[in-house]
Design a protein with these regions (language model features):
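Helix-to-loop junction immediately C-terminal to a conserved catalytic motif
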Residues: 50
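A short, proline-enriched helix->beta-strand linker immediately N-terminal to the Walker B motif
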Residues: 171-175
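Helix N-cap at the start of a conserved alpha-helix in ABC-type nucleotide-binding domains
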Residues: 188-189
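ABC ATPase NBD coupling module
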Residues: 67-89, 127-130
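Conserved ABC ATPase signature
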Residues: 152-156, 160
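Catalytic Walker B motif of ABC-type/P-loop ATPase nucleotide-binding domains
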Residues: 177-180
Length: 189
């Protein structure tokens, strides 16, 4: 069974057909590159996979579980969108780092927000925060950015910002990691 199964995804914006009957399978550990000209729908496909856009047709499954089926309204519940998004990590083309937060804070923020939704958060807030920071520091080290944890995005190069965005996406331990324009700011190291 494929880790990711996309079947018949279509997306229209008014009379513009951006995605037409897109299907793909991705096995665990496999990498897939989607190459196309500007405006060909690559970003729209990623946005549909992450439920930032709603596909008009088709089915999205992760590890055999149906996350979206255009023909099944039960998969359209807004209350389930956040849970569905946790299957995917997305590194945006422009990284979308929060300018008012340090590299470390950018990585821990999503984990903090998720933790706050749990009933045990108030009693264990300090321990949870410490655990999230430790994980973020480990990811920064893996990205070669340990010395940049207290730097703000404007103090980082484009490649460094991208690596912080990758660390942020990895922090939530997604099943699938998606990159929009992954080579746009890589340092030539």
């Amino acid at each position: 069974m494929a880790l990711l199964e996309v079947t018949g995804i279509s997306k229209n914006f008014g009379s513009t057909h951006v995605l037409q009957n897109i299907s793909l399978n991705l096995e665990k550990g496999e990498a897939l590159a989607i190459i196309g000209s500007s405006g060909s729908g690559k970003t729209t496909l990623l946005r549909c996979l992450n439920f930032l856009e709603t596909p008009d047709t088709g089915v999205i499954r992760v590890d055999g579980k149906t996350l979206w089926d255009a023909a099944d309204p039960a998969t359209h519940r807004e209350s389930e969108v956040r849970k569905k998004r946790l299957h995917f990590g997305l590194v945006f083309q422009n990284f979308n780092l929060f300018p008012q937060y340090t590299a470390l804070q950018n990585i821990t923020l999503a984990g903090e927000l998720l933790a706050k939704e749990k009933p045990e958060y108030k009693a264990n807030r300090k321990a949870i925060h410490a655990e999230l920071e430790e994980k973020a520091r480990t990811l920064l080290a893996q990205m070669g950015l340990s010395e940049r944890e207290n730097h703000y995005p404007h103090q980082l190069s484009g490649g460094q910002q991208q690596r912080v965005a990758i660390a942020r996406a990895l922090a939530l331990e997604p099943d699938i990691l998606c990159f929009d324009e992954p080579t746009s700011a890589l340092d030539p190291e």
